[in-house]
Swiss-Prot record:
Record lineage: Bacteria, Pseudomonadati, Pseudomonadota, Betaproteobacteria, Neisseriales
Gene expressing this chain: dapE
Entry's cofactor comment: Binds 2 Zn(2+) or Co(2+) ions per subunit.
This protein's name: Succinyl-diaminopimelate desuccinylase
The keyword tRNA processing is assigned to this record: no
Pathway terms, separated by semicolons: Amino-acid biosynthesis; L-lysine biosynthesis via DAP pathway; LL-2,6-diaminopimelate from (S)-tetrahydrodipicolinate (succinylase route): step 3/3
Subunit structure: Homodimer.
Length: 381
C-alpha cells in the first residue's frame, strides 16, 4: 500500500455531498472496503440518520474508531476558491467540505486498518468503527442510539479514538482526553405589558431580571481543576419588546449556556440558577436541556500509546486537553473504558475553504496504525 491511499479515500468521501443527516452512501463505501479485510457490518438506522457498526474480531480488547460522515452546509458556494464537494489539491493542502471535519480522519483510520491487518492478520482483540451521519445536526438518532444498542447487549469498548480535528499548530500537538458538559436554559421572564408613560400600571420584565442577570454573570460556579477550566456561564440571546418605543414588554426571553467541569453537576447548576432567580423575585418559566455530561479519561494506557505514536511519527509531544466544544465522545464514554479524540488540524473546520495539509494525511494514518499495533499486535512493538 502506498501513502496515496489515504488521500484517495479522503477525496472519495469528500466528493459525496453528505450534508447532515445525509450520508450519501459514504458508509456503504467504508463497509465495502473493510469487508475485504474481514470486517462485519451492522447497519443501525434511525429515522433519517444512517449509522454503521463495523467490527473485526469477537474478543477483547476492543479498539474502536468513532466518526461521522455528515458535514455542515457549505455556506455561499461562490465564496469558495474551488467547489466544496470537488476535493482539490492546492498549495500543499486538500480543500473540500469535510476535509478536516472529519472525512480525512475516517479515511486515515480505514487505511491504517488495512495495513495493520495485512501485517497482523491474527491480531489480538477486535477492531471496530462506529460511524454516524448525525453528529453535525441534532445528534438524536446517531451515536447515542448506537451506544444504547451496544450497551443493551453488553458490547463494551476498551479503547476509543474519536477522529475529531484536534491539532492546533501541528499534527499531533493536542489530544482531547475529556470534554466539558453542556447545559442550556431557555428562560421566559414574565411581566405585564403597558404604556411606557405609565410604568406603575405595568411590570417591566427587563428591569426585574436585570439584578438577577448581574448576579448570574458574576457568579463563580466552580474553580475548575487540573483537567478542566472553571465552569462558564454565557448568555447567547436576549429578546424583549415589541419593537415600539412606547410599550413596556410583557415578557423577556433569555437563552444561556453552561460549559461545566467535573467540579459541578447538572442538578447543582440548575438549583443555583433557580435560587438566584427566586432570590430576586423574578417571575419566570425555565426549560432545561443538557446535551452532554463532562467526561475525562485519565492519563493511562491509551493516552500513553497515542502520545508515543505521535512522537514517533510527527516528532511532537502531545498535550492532553479538555478545551473546546462537545463531541460524540460524550455518548460513547458510557461504554468505553478509555477515550480520546485525535485528528487533523481544527483551524478551518466549518469554514469556507476548509482544508487539511496534504503531508498530514499519511502521517495521521501512520499514527492510527501505530496505536493499533501497540494495542493489538501479537507481540508488543
Amino acid at each position: 500500500m502506498t501513502e496515496t491511499q489515504s488521500l484517495e479515500l479522503a477525496k472519495a468521501l469528500i466528493s459525496r455531498p453528505s450534508v447532515t443527516p445525509d450520508d450519501r452512501d459514504c458508509q456503504k463505501l467504508l463497509a465495502e472496503r473493510l469487508h475485504k479485510i474481514g470486517f462485519a457490518a451492522e447497519e443501525l438506522h434511525f429515522g433519517d440518520t444512517k449509522n454503521i457498526w463495523l467490527r473485526r474480531g469477537t474478543k477483547a480488547p476492543v479498539v474502536c474508531f468513532a466518526g461521522h460522515t455528515d458535514v455542515v452546509p457549505t455556506g455561499p458556494v461562490e465564496k469558495w476558491d474551488s467547489p466544496p464537494f470537488e476535493p482539490t489539491e492546492r498549495d500543499g493542502r486538500l480543500y473540500g467540505r469535510g476535509a478536516a471535519d472529519m472525512k480525512t480522519s475516517i479515511a486515515c483510520f480505514v487505511t491504517a486498518c488495512e495495513r495493520f491487518v495485512a501485517e497482523h492478520p491474527d491480531h489480538q482483540g477486535s477492531i471496530a468503527l462506529l460511524i454516524t451521519s448525525d453528529e453535525e445536526g441534532d445528534a438524536l438518532d446517531g451515536t447515542t442510539k448506537v451506544v444504547d444498542v451496544l450497551k443493551a447487549r453488553g458490547e463494551l469498548i476498551d479503547y476509543c479514538i474519536v477522529g475529531e480535528p484536534t491539532a492546533v499548530d501541528k499534527l499531533g500537538d493536542m489530544i482531547k482526553n475529556g470534554r466539558r458538559g453542556s447545559l442550556s436554559g431557555s428562560l421566559t421572564v414574565k411581566g405585564k405589558q403597558g404604556h411606557i408613560a405609565y410604568p406603575h400600571l405595568a411590570v417591566n420584565p427587563i428591569h426585574t431580571f436585570a439584578p438577577a442577570l448581574l448576579e448570574l454573570t458574576q457568579e463563580i460556579w466552580d474553580e475548575g481543576n487540573e483537567y478542566f477550566p472553571p465552569t462558564s456561564f454565557q448568555i447567547s440571546n436576549i429578546n424583549g419588546g415589541t419593537g415600539a418605543t412606547n410599550v413596556i414588554p410583557g415578557e423577556l426571553n433569555v437563552k444561556f449556556n453552561f460549559r461545566f467541569s467535573t467540579e459541578s453537576t447538572e442538578t447543582g447548576l440548575k438549583q443555583r440558577v433557580h435560587a438566584i432567580l427566586d432570590k430576586h423575585g423574578v417571575q419566570y418559566d425555565l426549560q432545561w436541556s443538557c446535551s452532554g455530561q463532562p467526561f475525562l479519561t485519565h492519563a493511562g494506557k491509551l493516552t500513553d500509546v497515542a502520545r508515543t505514536a505521535i512522537a514517533e511519527t510527527c516528532g511532537v509531544e502531545a498535550e492532553l486537553s479538555t478545551t473546546g466544544g462537545t463531541s460524540d465522545g460524550r455518548f460513547i464514554k458510557a461504554i468505553a473504558k478509555e477515550l480520546i479524540e485525535l485528528g487533523p488540524s481544527n483551524a478551518t473546520i466549518h469554514q469556507i475553504n476548509e482544508n487539511v495539509r496534504l503531508d498530514d494525511i499519511p502521517k495521521l494514518s501512520a499514527v492510527y496504525e501505530r496505536i493499533l499495533a501497540r494495542l493489538l499486535a501479537e507481540k508488543a512493538v
